[in-house]
Every structure is written in C-alpha cells, then in structure tokens.
Amino acid sequence: MLRLFAVLLLALPLRLAAQLPSVSPVMVYAGENGAETEGTDYDGDAPFAATFKACPENVGEYTAIYEWQFTRQGESTPFLRRYEEDTQYTFNQSGSYTVQLLATFVLGADTVQYSQAETGEAFSVAISESKLEVPNAFTPNGDGVNDVFAVKEGYKSIISFKARIFDRWGKKLYEWTDPAGGWDGRSSGGKAPDGAYYLNIEAKGADGKQYNIKKVINLLRGYTDKDSAN
C-alpha cells in the first residue's frame, strides 16, 4: 500500500503531521481464481477491470478533491480523468498505461496536496496484443482429455467473442460467447454423432485485430489416447 507524503501550502498555524490528511492509493483487481488482489502493476491480457481507491485518512473537516489520471505510454496528456474517491476502469486496448492520483485537501487557507507523479509511484498497466487459435478436432468420450471443443489455451486479450457450431445441413447446434467456454459435443439433449461439423468464430482483440474463423472440425467420440499410442 502506497502512502503519499504531503506538501502543505499557505499553512496558517502549522499542523502536526499526524493530523494532516493523507492517502494510500491502491489498485484492486481479480487475480488468480477470481480472488481480490492488490498490486502496483499488471502485465496481462484484456479485458482487465481494476478499481482504484484513494484510501484517505484523517480528512476531518478538510474538503477532499480527487483526480485520477489515465495516460498512455508515450503521451503526456491523460486520455481520461476521473474525479471520485474510488473509480473503476476496464482496459480493452493493448498497450502500456499509467494511472496516478492527485489528491488535494483544503481547509480555509490550508492546502495539502498529494501526487503520485511526484513520488514516481504511479500504477502501471500493460495489456498484451491479442491471440486466438482453435484446434481441428476433439474427443468427447468422457476420459477427461479433450472432451470439450474450445479455443486453444493461451488466448490473449479477446474483448468480444462469438462461436457457433453447425451440422452439415447448416443447422446451428451450439453457440457460446466466452472464449473460456466450449462445446461438449451434445445437441438437443443427446450426443452428436461422430463426423465433421462447421465452426464459425467472430472475435475482436484488444489490439483491434478481427478474427473471422470458418473451418471444419471433427468430432471423434470413439478416439482415445490408446489409439494415439498404437
């Protein structure tokens, strides 16, 4: 947790440091297994949703003014400013960003100001370029291996996604809109037979890349790992 030190401007009687308002800004996001995580930096894929909290202390009778600044790497002017104590933002574009808090506390002629820019403790967010690949077949035989048709592990920064499965006559059998999802080889409550099916994926990456994947996939329910060993 970061604690920013105060600059006291136009102070009347000098107040004890312990009595001055302060902030300890944090970035909170969902980490592994969805657990709430606090950190100063993030390097991963989109969409990345984070909550930025000022965590003020000793505000007392001071009037608090907050300004969160979101800036892209290589740019000097923030592309977004927020003016609440806590703010939430979802990063949907690839690239590197800094997020910093400027907090000002005013009481009469007393002004106490905190700036992450001056302390060099701004939050850092890096969003990767997108990646999306799909296999050619799956084997929904209940052996726990390759039982669900899904995009390959390691997909990155996919911000919109829609996949559909059709049979050879063009009937839609299944649809899903989360790249973490997939088709278990069932249709209308029963098992779809072995054979060729048609996959259509429309997706978009955080880097603006469009994915339009149309291909034939094979359902091989009778295939097992023992077959590959022979």
Pin down the residues of each PLM region:
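Signal that preferentially marks extracellular ectodomain short beta-strand elements
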Residues: 83-93, 107, 181-192
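Surface-exposed, flexible coil segments in extracellular/virion-facing regions
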Residues: 60-89
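Short, compositionally biased P/S/T/A/G/V-rich stretches that sit at domain boundaries
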Residues: 18-43, 129-142
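Bacterial Sec-dependent N-terminal signal peptides
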Residues: 1-23
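Short loop/turn motifs at secondary-structure boundaries
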Residues: 42, 48-56, 123-230
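Extracellular and select intracellular beta-sandwich modules with Ser/Thr-enriched
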Residues: 83, 110-121, 210-215
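Short, solvent-exposed loop/turn segments at the edges of extracellular beta-sandwich modules
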Residues: 104-113, 204-208
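Exposed beta-strand face motif in extracellular beta-rich ectodomains
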Residues: 95-99, 195-197
